């Protein structure tokens, strides 16, 4: 009899319990938005501010509809700025003329529109590229003109000398300025540290930094160059930790650390010896929050095996940082079917030892559904929404469950949320006859309309990715 009473009480409790929302996946799903050469956005220089904003909003809307949750936006292509800067001139990729005010702040606009849609916005900087071509017309306040002693001509490039401590410090200060003034979610750098080798007969053209080596160097030249980049990466990471510890630092190096590593790997470029990028060291030391090796090869590539390279990077991670490879969605075509990208993402999920993630190179191929790749990903890979993962190595407390009030408003409900510090997004889950649906919105929003539902659950997603317990309303 006592057992029957316990069973009855348990069933009654279940009947009275509020519907609990399903746990959401945690996965970084991003796309690079390149502004250099107008690759992704704006589609050409000189568009009106209205046209530029319209293009970016469409790109963000399509990204959300696809299932992405982050954008990596290039804001400093070549010592220029896609934001209001006291250090560097306006980028010519906006107006066609370096230094000309575009009439709005593209980065501020991008942050607002991304967060409004539940997208993280990572600001992507090229730390040392000063000009893509030495013949380009530059403004009088460009670093090439204001500090020519920091600049080296290398082939067609103009380059900030990584061997000059003042030049390194300048690039760090440019990035810290953005961290301090803008509500970005991450600072991102790609594979350009020392420049890619410029051909010179049968040998690469030497980088012209012997004067810097004589002033600042010690030991062997190649080791000194690597130490310059190591010091830059470590200093930047530590400075951002002190300034805004919740802002991620991510780097997307060349996908092969060294030729022959792992065994059997072939590479036409030695990033360790020619770009002086010891990306394995940065990962091992924990000087990044995520590493995004550019694994642009196919799964069945013999000399550059995608799963073999991914497994190697995952295994070089004693600090348990995020390993989120970049994938070459732009190569979908006759030789690479769209299914390759879905299969690569599946491999990333299976081989990851932490939270999985990836970024598409580049946004244009996804947004414009190159050879049907977007439709395929929506149908097979991104059926369920995902939140960006937390950084488990950062000390942060779980946000409090949100406080909200629901009131009728015509055919919808008005949901009012109480402000919370240290929260990036509200995660709203609604249960209807069709199941649970999810939307993610900016935590600055304190009033939103929702459709009537059997249950509504709201959680707070903290700045470091920690999710609160949900506050639940049920009919």
Positions of predicted regions on the chain:
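Active-site-adjacent "subsite" loops/lids of carbohydrate-active enzymes
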Residues: 34-54, 123, 128-181, 274
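Catalytic domains of carbohydrate-active enzymes, especially glycoside hydrolases
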Residues: 54-80, 182-185
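Aromatic-lined carbohydrate-binding/catalytic grooves of carbohydrate-active enzymes
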Residues: 66-102
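Aromatic- and acidic-residue-enriched segments that line the glycan-binding/catalytic groove
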Residues: 81-96, 129-155, 191-216, 261-270
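Active-site neighborhood of glycoside hydrolase catalytic domains
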Residues: 170-176, 180-290, 294-309, 316-320
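Substrate-binding cleft of secreted/luminal carbohydrate-active enzymes
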Residues: 276-302, 313-314, 319-394
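Conserved aromatic anchor
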Residues: 411-422
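Beta-strand-rich modules
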Residues: 448-468
């Amino acid at each position: 009899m006592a057992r029957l009473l316990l069973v009855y009480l348990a069933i009654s409790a279940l009947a009275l319990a509020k519907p609990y929302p399903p746990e959401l996946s945690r996965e970084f799903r991003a796309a690079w938005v390149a502004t250099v050469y107008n690759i992704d956005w704006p589609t050409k220089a000189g568009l009106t501010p209205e046209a530029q904003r319209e293009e970016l909003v469409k790109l963000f809307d399509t990204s959300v509809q696809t299932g992405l949750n982050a954008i990596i936006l290039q804001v400093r292509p070549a010592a220029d700025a896609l934001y209001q800067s006291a250090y560097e001139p306006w980028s010519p990729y906006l107006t066609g003329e370096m230094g000309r005010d575009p009439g709005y702040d593209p980065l501020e606009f991008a942050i607002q529109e991304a967060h409004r849609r539940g997208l993280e916005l990572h600001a992507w900087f090229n730390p040392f590229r000063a000009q893509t071509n030495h013949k380009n017309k530059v403004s009088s306040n460009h670093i090439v003109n204001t500090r020519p002693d920091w600049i080296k001509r290398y082939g067609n490039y103009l380059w900030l000398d990584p061997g000059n401590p003042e030049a390194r410090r300048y690039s760090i200060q440019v990035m810290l300025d953005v961290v301090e003034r803008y509500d970005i979610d991450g600072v991102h750098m790609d594979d350009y540290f020392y420049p890619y080798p410029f051909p010179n007969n049968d040998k690469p053209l030497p980088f012209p930094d012997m004067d810097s080596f004589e002033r600042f160097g010690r030991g062997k030249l190649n080791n000194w160059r690597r130490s310059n980049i190591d010091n830059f990466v470590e200093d930047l990471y530590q400075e951002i930790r002190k300034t805004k510890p919740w802002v991620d630092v991510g780097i997307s190096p060349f996908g092969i650390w060294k030729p022959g590593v792992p065994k059997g790997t072939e590479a036409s470029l030695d990033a360790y010896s020619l770009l002086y990028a010891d990306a394995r060291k940065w990962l091992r030391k924990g000087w990044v929050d995520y590493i995004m090796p550019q694994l642009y090869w196919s799964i069945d590539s013999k000399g550059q095996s995608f799963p073999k390279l991914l497994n190697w990077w995952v295994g070089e991670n004693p600090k348990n940082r995020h390993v989120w490879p970049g994938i070459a969605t732009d190569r979908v075509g006759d030789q690479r079917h769209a299914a390759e990208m879905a299969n690569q993402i599946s491999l990333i999920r299976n081989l990851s030892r932490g939270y999985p993630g990836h970024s598409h190179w580049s946004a244009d191929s996804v947004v414009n559904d190159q050879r049907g790749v977007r439709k395929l990903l929506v149908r097979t890979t991104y059926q369920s929404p995902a939140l960006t993962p937390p950084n488990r190595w950062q000390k942060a407390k779980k946000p409090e469950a949100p406080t909200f009030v629901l009131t009728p408003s015509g055919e919808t409900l008005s949901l009012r949320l109480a402000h919370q510090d240290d929260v990036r997004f509200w995660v709203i889950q609604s249960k209807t006859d069709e199941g649970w649906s999810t939307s993610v919105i900016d935590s600055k929003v304190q009033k939103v309309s929702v459709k009537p539902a059997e249950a509504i659950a709201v959680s707070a997603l903290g700045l470091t990715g920690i999710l609160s317990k949900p506050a639940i309303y049920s009919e």
